[in-house]
């Protein structure tokens, strides 16, 4: 395991792990530092939402867990962490491609294809967040996907060229770090999050138990309370 600093984050780099989130879960709270990263270039059992698995070819993508210990963040506002991570990934990807959006709750899309997945687990003490373990997978240099996932895509497939992973890591963490500075400005984060929601404009096909239908998404905005400013 190697330790180094990148863009204000302390990185613990492992050659291979089953899951960076699972490794982070095993660490005692005393060893979890704010803006700490557990990174691997070979994740063998990456976890997605529910029972899903995250496919990542060895040495091709970003697989990491970012640990936050936000000061005095109320448990009721824990979604601020999700918005920080999702918007940080969106900001990074938007440097390379257009049409990047966030699909509720934690996926990042380019057009109709998924390029990044996020899995966040919180430890709560009383009314506040003790720590947040933010698992992040971003498809960077993968040339093809072998799982039955319906719509994955990588920057390599979109750009037609490989990107240097260490530089990509630095850029991604810099974007996440800038968004983390907004962690206590919930309304500001929420406004950006809603503006970049997947399919927030236009008419699309949707499906429910009655079949396929066409509709547009309507966002309902409410006036924030003074506490949310």
Predicted regions span which residues?
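Acidic (Asp/Glu) carboxylate-rich active-site/surface patches
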Residues: 10, 85-127, 137
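Short beta-strand segments
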Residues: 39-41, 65, 103, 119-121, ...
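Short, acidic (Asp/Glu-rich) active-site segment that either coordinates a divalent metal cofactor
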Residues: 127-157
């Amino acid at each position: 395991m190697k330790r180094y600093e990148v863009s204000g984050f302390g990185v613990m780099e492992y050659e291979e792990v089953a899951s960076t989130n699972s490794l982070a879960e095993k660490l005692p709270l005393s060893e979890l530092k704010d803006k700490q990263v557990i990174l691997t270039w070979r994740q063998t059992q990456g976890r997605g939402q529910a029972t899903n698995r995250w496919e990542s070819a060895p040495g091709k993508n970003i697989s990491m867990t970012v640990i936050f210990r936000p000061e005095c963040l109320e448990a009721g506002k824990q979604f601020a962490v999700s918005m920080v991570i999702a918007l940080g990934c969106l900001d990074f990807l938007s440097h390379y491609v257009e049409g990047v959006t966030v699909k509720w709750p934690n996926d990042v899309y380019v057009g109709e294809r998924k390029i990044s997945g996020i899995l966040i687990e919180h430890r709560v003490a009383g009314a506040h967040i003790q720590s947040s373990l933010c698992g992040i997978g971003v498809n960077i240099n993968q040339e093809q996907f072998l799982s039955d996932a319906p719509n994955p895509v990588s920057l390599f497939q979109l750009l037609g060229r490989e990107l240097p992973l260490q530089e990509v890591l630095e850029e991604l963490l810099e974007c996440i770090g800038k968004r983390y500075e907004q962690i206590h400005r919930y309304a500001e984060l929420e406004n950006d999050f809603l503006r970049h929601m997947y399919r927030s404009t236009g008419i699309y096909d949707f499906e429910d138990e009655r079949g396929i239908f066409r509709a547009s998404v309507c966002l309902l905005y409410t006036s924030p309370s003074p506490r949310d400013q």
